[in-house]
Amino acid sequence: MFTLKKSLLLLFFLGTISLSLCQREADDDQGEVQQEVKRGFLSTVKNLATNVAGTVIDTIKCKVTGGCRK
């Protein structure tokens, strides 16, 4: 009976460690996903700002030179 208790205790201990490691890894994966989403969002904002700035510069250049085509 004592041997059975030791075996069950060992299995419980190993299962607890395994579960803890899986939970920690899942938390790390969620952090990586959030970083990728932030990176994608910032990239979109940067591209939008670049396009708007280019359009504004073209409009100003057109008005200054007076050579606008419509």
Swiss-Prot record:
Cystines in this chain: 62-68
Q: Say if the entry is tagged with keyword Signal.
A: yes
User: What residues does the annotated propeptide cover?
Assistant: 21-39
Q: Name one GO biological process term.
A: defense response to Gram-negative bacterium
Matching InterPro entries, A to Z? Antimicrobial_frog_2 (IPR012521), Frog_antimicrobial_propeptide (IPR004275)
Write out the coiled-coil annotation as residue ranges. Answer: none
Q: What does this protein do?
A: Antimicrobial peptide.
Q: Which family does it belong to?
A: Belongs to the frog skin active peptide (FSAP) family. Ranatuerin subfamily.
- The molecule here is called Ranatuerin-2Pa
